[in-house]
Amino acid sequence: MSSSRKILDAPKKFREKLKDFNEERKKPREPITTKASMFSIFSWAFYDLGNTIFSVLIVSFYFGLWVVSDEVGGTDSDYGYANAISMALVFLTAPLIGALSDQARRKMPFLFVTTLLCVAFTALLGYEKDGWSKSTILTVSLIFFVIANYFYQAGLIFYDSTLATISTPGNKGRIGGIGIGVGYVGALVGILSALFITDTLGFPYPAVFQLTAALFLIFAIPCFIFVRETPGDNFWPSLMILMATLLGINAWLVENNMLLRYTTVFFAIWCVFSS
């Protein structure tokens, strides 16, 4: 078929696709409560609200502001390096976490542990003891940030996999959309709360870190309690698949050592531009 013929047929194919799309839209949609109640769905979505508060207040705004404040005298580079290190750790361990998430009979225990660790180290940001210098306070908090952000990112992998617990292929997109929408509410809640305690009440930035930890935990609790998993009886087959996956990842990394070099260069460039 000539190129001119393809151009002439394009409007016809577009109309056919549009017709198929409209016919698909007319079909009755599967209710979002097919697999779980609306209460369970919003309990799941509230976790998204909580972790968005962490993302906005800690990763995007207040921790970086605290690092460069006169209180500790850090630089943008200090925060950039810490963020790069935490993301590098996520990048290197994501295949293992993903394999574990895919093959584990229950995801919620892993989500619970990663969330608690993130919350604990978030609450410790800005921690200081009598006699500590500014550089010591900064270094300790940067280490805590690396750990908190790592477990936040790891928790996202397990959280996303729990969507299958409350959804079906027919309503997964809409339920996921509810989580995203509730997450945007979390951004607003976090910013307004932080502004209130810093600008109105006059608390220092570390109070925002503790507030973030508390809000994250509070909004995560409904997900842990009311989202019920139904684990199957395939423990040993899943364990075998998991081990085979991990061995396959290890073999691939050994054979493709270029990945390590690429990762090193990538994060070196990131650190340079962050400084």
Spans of model-derived segments:
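Cytoplasmic helix-loop-helix junction between adjacent transmembrane helices
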Residues: Y150-G181
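C-terminal ends and interior cores of transmembrane alpha-helices
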Residues: T115-K134
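Helix-loop boundary and gating motifs at the non-cytosolic
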Residues: R29-M87
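Hydrophobic core of transmembrane alpha-helices in multi-pass small-molecule transporters
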Residues: F121, K134-G155
